[in-house]
């Protein structure tokens, strides 16, 4: 095992891509905190599957839009070990025509996708410094606008900006901050292979040397190609 008594927290891990990422990190030897918003049975099922496969995992239910719930979640994580990896995967992805998006719709998407990531990062930093790893999951919405998810595209692009700014801010603290950007929509059972490729890249970034790899967006196009390059504006 690479880490002993080390924890990775994966948000939005009750199913789909988040669950696959959680399973992959557990195979790498990390204890995984499986976060879901409110459906404890989903987190319990993913954690149980990891344990059945010989890994270590536990449920960590919290709505990332609620600062108090996020703080309590990190207290639970601290009771299980030392947090070394944070994967911000939670997002809210409604399809809406831009003409129908209300103020509440806009703020709800941002509160989960962007603000939720910031809340988790803020709580994680005391234990991530020094030497921790943050991996943010973007998506094609961040790099190419989605006409049916304008609010999500804006929030994911904000998460890209947060990734780059944090990489610069935390470099001297030995914390690597990177992002993975799936090139396709990761919803649907037909994309199991794609999810595995994405999870593999998340695991690579979780163990990357901060001095060599930070402020990088890894684009996974799910056709066998991976593009990894620093993003410079």
Each predicted region: which residue ranges?
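Conserved glycine-rich cofactor-binding loop
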Residues: 7, 14-15
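Alpha-helical segment proximal to the catalytic Tyr-Lys
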Residues: 126, 168-169, 211
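Substrate-binding pocket helix/loop in short-chain dehydrogenase/reductase
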Residues: 97-98, 105-110
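Active-site helix of classical SDR
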Residues: 121, 155, 163
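Conserved glycine-rich Rossmann-like NAD(P)H-binding loop of the short-chain dehydrogenase/reductase
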Residues: 30-43
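The beta1-alpha1 cofactor-binding region of Rossmann-like NAD(H)/NADP(H)-dependent oxidoreductases
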Residues: 40, 61-72, 103
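C-terminal helical subdomain
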Residues: 172, 179-180, 189-228
């Amino acid at each position: 095992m690479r880490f002993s008594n080390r924890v990775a927290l994966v948000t939005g891990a009750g199913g789909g891509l988040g669950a696959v990422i959680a399973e992959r990190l557990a195979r790498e030897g990390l204890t995984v905190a499986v976060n879901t918003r409110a459906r404890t049975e989903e987190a319990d099922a993913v954690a149980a599957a990891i344990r059945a496969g010989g890994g270590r995992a536990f449920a960590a239910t919290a709505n990332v839009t609620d600062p108090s719930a996020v703080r309590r979640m990190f207290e639970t994580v601290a009771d299980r070990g030392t947090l070394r990896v944070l994967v911000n995967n939670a997002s809210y992805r409604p399809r809406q025509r831009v003409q129908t998006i209300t103020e509440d719709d806009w703020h709800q998407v941002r509160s989960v996708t962007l603000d939720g990531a910031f809340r988790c990062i803020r709580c994680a930093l005391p234990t991530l410094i020094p030497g921790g790893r943050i991996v943010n999951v973007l998506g094609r919405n961040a790099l190419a606008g989605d006409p049916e998810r304008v609010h999500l595209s804006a929030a994911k692009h904000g998460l890209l900006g947060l990734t780059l700014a944090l990489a610069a801010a935390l470099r001297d603290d030995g914390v690597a901050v990177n992002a993975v950007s799936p090139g396709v929509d990761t919803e649907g059972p037909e994309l199991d292979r794609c999810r595995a490729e994405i999870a593999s890249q998340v695991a690579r970034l979780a163990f990357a040397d901060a001095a060599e790899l930070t402020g990088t967006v890894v684009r996974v196009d799910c056709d066998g190609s991976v593009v990894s390059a620093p993003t410079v504006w």
